[in-house]
Amino acid sequence: MVDDKEKNMKCLTFFLMLPETVKNRSKKGSKKANSSGGGGGGGSVGSGSSKLPPVCYEIITLKTKKKKKMAADIFPRKKPANSSSTTVQQQHQHNLCNNNLIPAPNWQGLYPTIRERNAVMFNNDLMADVHFVVGPPGGTQRLPGHKYVLAVGSSVFHAMFYGELAEDKDEIRIPDVEPAAFLAMLKYIYCDEIDLAADTVLATLYAAKKYIVPHLARACVNFLETSLSAKNACVLLSQSCLFEEPDLTQRCWEVIDAQAELALKSEGFCDIDFQTLESILRRETLNAKEIVVFEAALNWAEVECQRQDLALSIENKRKVLGKALYLIRIPTMALDDFANGAAQSGVLTLNETNDIFLWYTASKKPELQFVSKARKGLVPQRCHRFQSCAYRSNQWRYRGRCDSIQFAVDKRVFIAGFGLYGSSCGSAEYSAKIELKRQGVVLGQNLSKYFSDGSSNTFPVWFEYPVQIEPDTFYTASVVLDGNELSYFGQEGMTEVQCGKVTVQFQCSSDSTNGTGVQGGQIPELIFYA
């Protein structure tokens, strides 16, 4: 009987530790035992083949297992047997989105893993022991938090809640972080999920940096690098310097250098700070005409006047530009660009205008405050895909048909144009329409003419602006040539070419209707910046 009492005490102890539903189950089990044994339960114990109540048996059995299993192994996720359980989970998700309490009393049973149960607490008032008022005045949002979870995910939160200087506040104001960005950070901390959007990624990066969540910050930088283009490169350059992200800064410079005119004409250029403006104007490798640089600086000055609540006058534009004006290499402009543009802008003083005109025309040139040395720009690289070229009496003829080839690179480059063969019958002029597509979408095209001298050399034909090419994706390069003379054509084509640090792969294109393929034909060269 002593043994019976000890076992009963163990069972009662476990009953106190188990949820209410298990208690009910145990009560049913004990009733069945009593009904089967009548009043002689003690005799069965004494026989040596005693049976424990069902709950106790299950507990002891689990304790004797040596191999530990994760919750997901013990309770594998299954599809709901009926629509009611699905409705419960949908309602639960609805409550999460609306920052409400969980209505289900036993919600823990719906989520088999600790990760899923932890995620339930995201943006949930249930058991919240701190609240954040996030956002600037007039645009705040009150968000719940759980100190333990936050401290595990961020050393800043750990110091805030459990450090030596921890403050016991129920509500914390964070005016310098956008609510959407703060929620994105909380979602990562609670759910181990990264949810980024183009319009909030910079704010999320700021939050991740502020609260030292390095993996989220790295994901933000990767997102920005992937979405980097001439339209946003200048803004991202400014932000990358602010966040001290040198890799992102380098990627921004690569885009700005190669697609300088597009970057300078973008709306984002006008949103940069003065320090970034100076950095761009100093840039030796900008691939842009100086008149474009000058016009971009004036556009920036106009927006800066608005930011400073200054009248849009010539004097104020020059005032906000300050010494940055002299970083524009006005003496290196074409004379027509200067005479019809900068000289008539009103930004230059009369003496400056006269001195620059003398710089163009006089043998004894005056001293100028402006930099008079032209920018170096970028040197284009050429990827030649044929090992030899030839001509025959009946090839290569053009009658408005398309020559096309597909290519892919292993790092981001900027296609500036194509190198094309010329006439094999002496000097001749060709009309060329070049085009670059990705999955049927035209990324760049240009119609121009080029003159060939009868040699087997290639002759460059340029796009209006370099086209950004992403790695590991096939693009289609096409050209339609119109000319009366037969031309040279390539032979012994290569499927892969190493050009500096860039590997280029080639494959045939279904757009080609004039015979060009990997082994031979036209488009012998890709001209690009890397």
Curated annotation (Swiss-Prot):
Residues 243-308 form the BACK domain. Residues 23-48 are annotated as: Disordered. SMART domains: BACK, BTB. Residues 36-46 have a biased composition (Gly residues). GO terms for cellular component: cytosol; nucleus. The gene is Btbd3. It is found in: Cytoplasm, Cytosol; Nucleus. This is BTB/POZ domain-containing protein 3. The keyword tRNA-binding does not apply. One of its GO terms (biological process) is cerebral cortex development. Signal peptide: none annotated. Keywords: Cytoplasm, Neurogenesis, Nucleus. Acts as a key regulator of dendritic field orientation during development of sensory cortex. Also directs dendrites toward active axon terminals when ectopically expressed. Residues 128-198 form the BTB domain.
